[in-house]
C-alpha cells in the first residue's frame, strides 16, 4: 500500500435540533400549559488512533466527514434525538492541526486514543423552559446552534526509538535490513529510499527497539532540493539519531563536508531536532584496511570537532553492527520516555458553543418578568418568538 503521511480533510459536526413551541391540548384539561420539548444535540466528530493502520491514503480520496443533525423537539415534552457521532480512524503517530488557526489539536500517540475535533451544536430549548409565575403561556423557544466546522491537516509521524540520518547511499537501508526484518529497497544509486520505513531490532526475547529509516538528505534540502526535508518530521519522536557517514564515498565527495551538510539541514528544519542526542557512525569500513579506516574516521571526527564516542561499522558485512545495537539498547533503557512528555497535549481547544445555554438562560433570567410580552408582535409567524444569538 502506498505510504501517505499528509492529508487534508473537512470535518463538520451536526447542528443542534430546534426547540418546540407547543401547548397541552387535552379533553377536560383547560389551559394545559406549555409542553414543547427541547431539540437534540448535534453529533460530534472524533479522531481515534488505530495501530492497525500505517498510512493516510484513505483520506486522499474521502475528504469530508459530517456528523448527524440533532432532531427537533416535539410536543408532550418530547426531546429530539441526539445526532450520531462520526469517528475517523487514523494511524498511531498522527498529529491533528487546525488549518484555520494553525493550532495543534492533539497528537495521537496511543492505540485507542480519542480526540474531539468538531463539537456538535447545542440543542434548542422548548417553550416549557420559559414558563414562569407571570408567563403561563410562553411562546419563546431557541433554535439549535450550528456544529463546528474545521479544515484539518493530518500529519503522520512515525513512532520510533532510533532515527537514521545521512546522505543518499550512506548505507541506511542496508543497515536496517541487517539489524531487522525490514526489507527496504537497496541499490547502487542515490534516493533508492523514497518513503520512510520502520524496523524492529530484537536484541533478545525481552529487549528490542524500533529504528526509522528516511530518505537521504542533500545540500539545499531545506529549499526543496532532492526529496526536501519533509521526512525529517518522522524523527521528531526519536530518542537518539544515528548519523551514518560513508567513510569512503565512491563518488569522491568529502565525508567531512557531507556530514556538515546533514547537520546544517537538520538545524534549518528544527533546533529541537538538532539538539537531540546524535551518534556518529562511520559505515562501509570493509572497503578499507582496519588501520586506514580507524585513521580516516579519527581525522573526520577531529575535522567536525566531534569529541564524543564514534562507531565504525560495515552494514553489508555486519562488522561492528551488533556492538552498536547493544549500545543503542543500553541508551534506550537508561533514558526512558518521560511519561509527562509522552502524554503532553496542547492547551484546551475552544469550541464555538461551549457556554451558549448558560449565557442564554442568564440573559432570560435577567429580563423583567412583567415585560415578557413587550416585544410581542401579532404578525409573528405562528405567534412564535425566536431567541437566537450567534
From Swiss-Prot:
Chain residue ranges for the region called Disordered:
127-147
Which terms under GO biological process does the entry name? Answer: ribosome biogenesis
* Domain OBG-type G per the UniProt entry, residue ranges: 160-333
Residue ranges constituting the Obg domain according to the UniProt record: 1-159
Query: Quick one: where is this thing mainly located?
Result: cytoplasm
Q: Which InterPro entries match?
A: G_OBG, GTP-bd, GTP-bd_Obg/CgtA, GTP1-OBG_CS, GTP1_OBG_dom, GTP1_OBG_dom_sf, OBG_GTPase, P-loop_NTPase
Family affiliation: Belongs to the TRAFAC class OBG-HflX-like GTPase superfamily. OBG GTPase family.
Official protein name in the record:
GTPase Obg
> What lineage, starting at the top, does this entry show?
Bacteria, Pseudomonadati, Pseudomonadota, Gammaproteobacteria, Enterobacterales
Amino acid at each position: 500500500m502506498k505510504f501517505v503521511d499528509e492529508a487534508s480533510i473537512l470535518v463538520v459536526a451536526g447542528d443542534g435540533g430546534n426547540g418546540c413551541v407547543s401547548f397541552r391540548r387535552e379533553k377536560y384539561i383547560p389551559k394545559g400549559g406549555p409542553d414543547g420539548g427541547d431539540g437534540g444535540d448535534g453529533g460530534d466528530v472524533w479522531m481515534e488512533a488505530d495501530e492497525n493502520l500505517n498510512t493516510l491514503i484513505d483520506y486522499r480520496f474521502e475528504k469530508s466527514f459530517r456528523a448527524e443533525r440533532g432532531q427537533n423537539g416535539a410536543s408532550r415534552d418530547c426531546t429530539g434525538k441526539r445526532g450520531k457521532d462520526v469517528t475517523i480512524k487514523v494511524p498511531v503517530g498522527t498529529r491533528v492541526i487546525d488549518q484555520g488557526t494553525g493550532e495543534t489539536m492533539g497528537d495521537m500517540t496511543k492505540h485507542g486514543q480519542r480526540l474531539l475535533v468538531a463539537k456538535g451544536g447545542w440543542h434548542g430549548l422548548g417553550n416549557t423552559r420559559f414558563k414562569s409565575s407571570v408567563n403561563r403561556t410562553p411562546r419563546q423557544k431557541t433554535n439549535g446552534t450550528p456544529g463546528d466546522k474545521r479544515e484539518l491537516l493530518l500529519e503522520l509521524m512515525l513512532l520510533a526509538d532510533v532515527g537514521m540520518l545521512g546522505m543518499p547511499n550512506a548505507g541506511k537501508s542496508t543497515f536496517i535490513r541487517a539489524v531487522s526484518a525490514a526489507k527496504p529497497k537497496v541499490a547502487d544509486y542515490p534516493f533508492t529510499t523514497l518513503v520512510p520505513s520502520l524496523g524492529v531490532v530484537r536484541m533478545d526475547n525481552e529487549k528490542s527497539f524500533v529504528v526509522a529509516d528516511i530518505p537521504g538528505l542533500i545540500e539545499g534540502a531545506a529549499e526543496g532540493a532532492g526529496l526536501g526535508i519533509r521526512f525529517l518530521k518522522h524523527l521528531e519522536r526519536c530518542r537518539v539519531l544515528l548519523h551514518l557517514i560513508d567513510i569512503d564515498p565512491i563518488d569522491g565527495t568529502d565525508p567531512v563536508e557531507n556530514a556538515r551538510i546533514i547537520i546544517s539541514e537538520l538545524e534549518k528544519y528544527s533546533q529541537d531536532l538538532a539538539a537531540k542526542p546524535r551518534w556518529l557512525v562511520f559505515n562501509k569500513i570493509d572497503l578499507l584496511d582496519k588501520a586506514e579506516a580507524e585513521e580516516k574516521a579519527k581525522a573526520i571526527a577531529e575535522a567536525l570537532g566531534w569529541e564524543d564516542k564514534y562507531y565504525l561499522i560495515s552494514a553489508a558485512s555486519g562488522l561492528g553492527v551488533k556492538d552498536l545495537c547493544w549500545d543503542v539498547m543500553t541508551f534506550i533503557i537508561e533514558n526512558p520516555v518521560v511519561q509527562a512528555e509522552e502524554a503532553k497535549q496542547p492547551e484546551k481547544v475552544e469550541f464555538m458553543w461551549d457556554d451558549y445555554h448558560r449565557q442564554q438562560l442568564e440573559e432570560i433570567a435577567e429580563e423583567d418578568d412583567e415585560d415578557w410580552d413587550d416585544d410581542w408582535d401579532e404578525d409573528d409567524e405562528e405567534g412564535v418568538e425566536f431567541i437566537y444569538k450567534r
